[in-house]
Amino acid sequence: MKITLRMMVLAVLTAMAMVLAACGGGGSSGGSTGGGSGSGPVTIEIGSKGEELAFDKTELTVSAGQTVTIRFKNNSAVQQHNWILVKGGEAEAANIANAGLSAGPAANYLPADKSNIIAESPLANGNETVEVTFTAPAAGTYLYICTVPGHYPLMQGKLVVN
């Protein structure tokens, strides 16, 4: 397999992100929120933490079958971000993020095969707000991530579906 510059950069960024995450404190970095107990439509506001590679909420709660609108605010002035809800665990989230690298910005940094993606926002440019509406899946815990190259290791959270 030929190792390209792009692959080397992704590997270095991923390794750096893992080191930074391992050095982080043990405290909570985000709250739980959501409109979860009802069955009516709910809008949840979430954003990025300024120029950090982090969501401002790391856990959201909704009810199975509920119509959910995620209003994602990119609070960075310069970076692009997105909000992607993944069907499957961490391995599937990593596969989606890695495939997004090859897909590029024209494809929202998402693979052509979206069978393991429950919901996806458009790319949000600096200080832009985007929305995605979907029906909450069956009860369980699902990961949401940003698939912009290098962001996935730090930009993830959990959607808890009751």
From Swiss-Prot:
This is Auracyanin-A. A lipid is attached at residue 23 (S-diacylglycerol cysteine). It is found in: Cell membrane. The lineage of its organism: Bacteria, Bacillati, Chloroflexota, Chloroflexia, Chloroflexales. It is a lipid-anchor. Keywords: Cell membrane, Copper, Electron transport, Lipoprotein, Membrane, Metal-binding, Palmitate, Signal, Transport. It comes from Chloroflexus aurantiacus (strain ATCC 29366 / DSM 635 / J-10-fl). PROSITE patterns: COPPER_BLUE, PROKAR_LIPOPROTEIN. Residues 42-162 form the Plastocyanin-like domain. One of its GO terms (molecular function) is copper ion binding. The keyword Secreted does not apply. Cu cation binds at residues 81, 146, 151, 155. A lipid is attached at residue 23 (N-palmitoyl cysteine). PANTHER family: AURACYANIN-B, OUTER MEMBRANE PROTEIN H.8. Binds 1 copper ion per subunit. Its cofactor is Cu cation. GO terms for cellular component: plasma membrane. Its main location: membrane.
